[in-house]
Amino acid sequence: MYRELIGELIKNNDWAQLQEPCPERDIDKAEKYVGYTFPDELKALLRETDGDRWFLLSVKEIIENVERNRNIMAEYFEPDEFLEKVDRHIFFATNGCGDYYCYRILPNGETDTAAIYLWEHELFETHAVAENMTDLIVKYYGGEI
Protein backbone atom coordinates (compact mmCIF):
# COMPACT_ATOMS: atom_id res chain seq x y z
CA MET A 1 0.00 0.00 0.00
CA TYR A 2 2.59 2.61 1.10
CA ARG A 3 5.19 1.51 -1.43
CA GLU A 4 2.79 2.00 -4.34
CA LEU A 5 1.56 5.34 -2.98
CA ILE A 6 5.05 6.73 -2.42
CA GLY A 7 6.31 5.34 -5.72
CA GLU A 8 3.59 7.24 -7.56
CA LEU A 9 4.20 10.46 -5.61
CA ILE A 10 7.98 10.47 -6.09
CA LYS A 11 8.18 9.48 -9.74
CA ASN A 12 9.24 13.05 -10.67
CA ASN A 13 11.43 13.52 -7.58
CA ASP A 14 15.14 13.06 -8.28
CA TRP A 15 16.12 12.70 -4.61
CA ALA A 16 13.63 10.33 -2.97
CA GLN A 17 14.33 6.64 -3.49
CA LEU A 18 12.30 3.81 -2.04
CA GLN A 19 14.48 1.38 -0.12
CA GLU A 20 14.23 -2.33 0.49
CA PRO A 21 11.74 -3.43 3.16
CA CYS A 22 13.04 -3.29 6.72
CA PRO A 23 13.51 -6.68 8.38
CA GLU A 24 11.24 -7.28 11.37
CA ARG A 25 14.25 -7.79 13.66
CA ASP A 26 15.48 -4.27 12.81
CA ILE A 27 12.06 -2.78 13.61
CA ASP A 28 12.15 -4.62 16.96
CA LYS A 29 15.67 -3.30 17.61
CA ALA A 30 14.58 0.27 16.84
CA GLU A 31 11.56 0.00 19.14
CA LYS A 32 13.77 -1.24 21.97
CA TYR A 33 16.29 1.54 21.42
CA VAL A 34 13.66 4.28 21.18
CA GLY A 35 11.89 2.82 24.20
CA TYR A 36 8.37 2.85 22.76
CA THR A 37 6.29 0.51 20.64
CA PHE A 38 5.87 1.87 17.13
CA PRO A 39 2.31 2.42 15.90
CA ASP A 40 1.03 -0.21 13.47
CA GLU A 41 1.04 2.20 10.52
CA LEU A 42 4.72 3.05 11.07
CA LYS A 43 5.63 -0.64 11.25
CA ALA A 44 3.61 -1.29 8.09
CA LEU A 45 5.48 1.52 6.30
CA LEU A 46 8.88 0.20 7.40
CA ARG A 47 7.94 -3.32 6.30
CA GLU A 48 7.44 -1.89 2.80
CA THR A 49 10.37 0.54 2.63
CA ASP A 50 13.16 1.29 5.09
CA GLY A 51 13.02 5.03 4.42
CA ASP A 52 13.27 6.91 1.15
CA ARG A 53 16.60 8.78 1.58
CA TRP A 54 14.71 12.06 1.51
CA PHE A 55 11.71 12.47 3.78
CA LEU A 56 11.18 9.12 5.51
CA LEU A 57 13.88 7.91 7.90
CA SER A 58 15.26 4.38 7.90
CA VAL A 59 15.32 2.48 11.20
CA LYS A 60 19.06 3.15 11.34
CA GLU A 61 18.40 6.88 11.02
CA ILE A 62 15.62 6.68 13.65
CA ILE A 63 18.08 5.09 16.09
CA GLU A 64 20.87 7.57 15.21
CA ASN A 65 18.51 10.49 15.78
CA VAL A 66 17.50 9.23 19.23
CA GLU A 67 21.14 8.59 20.11
CA ARG A 68 22.12 12.11 19.01
CA ASN A 69 19.25 13.67 20.96
CA ARG A 70 20.12 11.74 24.12
CA ASN A 71 23.85 12.44 23.86
CA ILE A 72 23.67 16.11 22.90
CA MET A 73 20.33 17.68 23.80
CA ALA A 74 19.81 16.02 27.18
CA GLU A 75 22.48 18.16 28.82
CA TYR A 76 20.54 21.35 28.03
CA PHE A 77 17.38 20.31 29.89
CA GLU A 78 16.31 19.10 33.28
CA PRO A 79 15.45 15.37 33.01
CA ASP A 80 11.67 15.86 33.12
CA GLU A 81 11.84 18.71 30.61
CA PHE A 82 14.00 16.64 28.23
CA LEU A 83 11.55 13.75 28.46
CA GLU A 84 8.58 16.00 27.70
CA LYS A 85 10.12 18.18 24.98
CA VAL A 86 12.41 15.73 23.18
CA ASP A 87 12.52 12.11 24.27
CA ARG A 88 8.79 11.42 24.45
CA HIS A 89 8.44 11.31 20.65
CA ILE A 90 8.94 8.77 17.88
CA PHE A 91 10.67 10.72 15.09
CA PHE A 92 10.35 8.95 11.73
CA ALA A 93 10.57 11.62 9.00
CA THR A 94 12.23 14.99 8.46
CA ASN A 95 11.57 18.20 6.61
CA GLY A 96 15.30 18.66 5.98
CA CYS A 97 15.49 21.82 8.09
CA GLY A 98 15.97 20.25 11.52
CA ASP A 99 12.30 19.58 12.25
CA TYR A 100 10.85 16.08 12.44
CA TYR A 101 7.52 14.41 11.85
CA CYS A 102 6.62 12.24 14.79
CA TYR A 103 4.18 10.55 17.07
CA ARG A 104 3.89 11.90 20.60
CA ILE A 105 4.11 9.61 23.59
CA LEU A 106 1.56 10.33 26.29
CA PRO A 107 2.61 10.54 29.96
CA ASN A 108 1.16 7.04 30.51
CA GLY A 109 3.60 5.65 27.91
CA GLU A 110 1.02 5.06 25.19
CA THR A 111 1.52 6.43 21.70
CA ASP A 112 -0.80 9.25 20.65
CA THR A 113 -2.06 8.03 17.28
CA ALA A 114 -4.78 10.68 16.97
CA ALA A 115 -2.48 12.65 14.65
CA ILE A 116 1.02 12.92 13.26
CA TYR A 117 2.91 15.93 14.54
CA LEU A 118 5.65 18.24 13.36
CA TRP A 119 8.29 18.72 16.07
CA GLU A 120 9.93 22.12 15.69
CA HIS A 121 13.54 22.06 16.82
CA GLU A 122 13.88 25.76 17.62
CA LEU A 123 10.96 25.82 20.05
CA PHE A 124 10.78 22.13 21.02
CA GLU A 125 7.05 22.24 20.31
CA THR A 126 4.74 20.05 18.28
CA HIS A 127 1.58 20.66 16.32
CA ALA A 128 -0.63 18.27 14.40
CA VAL A 129 -0.08 18.23 10.63
CA ALA A 130 -1.74 15.01 9.44
CA GLU A 131 -4.45 12.58 10.44
CA ASN A 132 -2.40 9.47 9.69
CA MET A 133 0.59 8.16 7.73
CA THR A 134 -1.15 8.20 4.35
CA ASP A 135 -2.33 11.78 4.91
CA LEU A 136 1.21 12.83 5.87
CA ILE A 137 2.82 11.22 2.82
CA VAL A 138 0.29 12.74 0.43
CA LYS A 139 0.58 16.19 2.01
CA TYR A 140 4.38 16.13 2.10
CA TYR A 141 4.93 15.02 -1.48
CA GLY A 142 2.05 17.23 -2.61
CA GLY A 143 3.83 20.28 -1.17
CA GLU A 144 1.13 21.02 1.43
CA ILE A 145 3.47 20.72 4.42
List PLM regions with ranges:
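Residue-identity detector for threonine
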Residues: T37, T49, T94, T111-T113, ...
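A broadly tuned preference for mixed-charge, low-complexity surface segments
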Residues: G96-C97, E110, V138-I145
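A ubiquitous, low-specificity "background" feature that marks scattered single residues
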Residues: K32, E67, I105, A114, ...
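Segments surrounding the PLD/"HKD" phosphodiesterase catalytic module and close analogs
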Residues: C102-A130
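Compact, glycine/acidic-enriched structural inserts
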Residues: E125-D135, K139-G142
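Generic alpha-helical propensity signal that fires on short helical segments
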Residues: W54-L56, K60, N108-E110, W119, ...
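A surface-exposed partner-binding patch
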Residues: M1-Y101, E144
